[in-house]
Amino acid sequence: MKLIGIDIGKNKHFFCIMDQQTGEIIFQPVSFSNDKEGFDFLIQKINSYPKDSVLIGMEDTGHYHFALLKYLLNLQYTVALINPKTTDFNRKMQGGITKNDKLDTINICDVLDTPERKKQYRISKVNSFDLYEQKQLTRHHHNLKEEENVYKNRLQKCIDIVFPEFNKLFNSKYSTVYMNILKTFGSAENIANTDIRTIRKCFEIEGRGNRISLTPERLKECARSSIGISSSAEVIQIKHLTAQIELIEEQLTEIDKKIEEFSIQNNSPILSIPGISHFSGTSILAELGDISNYSKPSQIIKFAGVAPLHYESSQFNAQHTSITKKGSKYLRKTLYQIILPVIRHNPVFNKYYQLKISQGKGHRCAQGHCVRKLLRIIYHLLKTNQQFDHQLLR
């Protein structure tokens, strides 16, 4: 077997070739450009070896390797992706202090040259790029939600200054009327000084289920007696922040439609679990990647970073530890977002949660136990392509 280690860069990459049987570097590290000409140069150097006797490895970091990875997969080469922490740890274990691109290619070959039982890489496949698109969309959704929460917090700060009583007038925040009033007036002072007919226009909305108990007259009355201060700076911020929030909502709607298309296309059995939506199901599948890369449930639990952290020394054993929080933070976030609906809609999970609470576990700890149980079920469903049936759970 010929091992080819590729160190990825923005404008150029380095590669070397190692003979796995002898451990000899048969082609010293050399660079090639990150373009078609450079890719052809790489193929020219390795096409003398049968494809089934070649294993190519590269670090799974950033995005600079995507074009090369897809190019090699389309040519039906076997490509292994390696966690950068693995190569860094391997270099340090060998006493390596110096780090450069040429030495990194050899280090990658060393990682590839591990027994099958202890392999520290995963084989990539052409269909992984379908999951890549889904992962980018679901991560973009997560990031937009975080951005929206920042804007909403800033908006609430501004409202507390110019109209502290405003939120008490509504059963829920960010409704159509709620946003219309903020966009149009921005403060209690502006509402109090505005003709009632103009205020009524903010309440004119179409569709069923959009009616609220608040009236324009009641709003104006509260604005007149408000303790809010007059601030043109806060009014400008409110108008800008409401516009940003509405823009993000439009973007999220567009993303949700595309994610639902992907979810229907995936037709995954994990959607049969009550509490898992199109978005959360797609996010879980995209973050996990190809399920064939995992041989047991504990591996995806570890990948999600929800395995309990165990610390034991010769005379010390920690009784209370947190989860590891390694791996995909997006997967971990999705799991903790959906676990409460799963517990609520599934009697087996609800019983398991109550059991952990009765054993003295805290709410967050009991959630963690349920998350790990959910991952074990997801692993089984994906491996067997079986629909969820709560009657089969123990």
Whereabouts are the PLM-identified features?
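A detector of single, family-specific signature residues
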Residues: 1-394
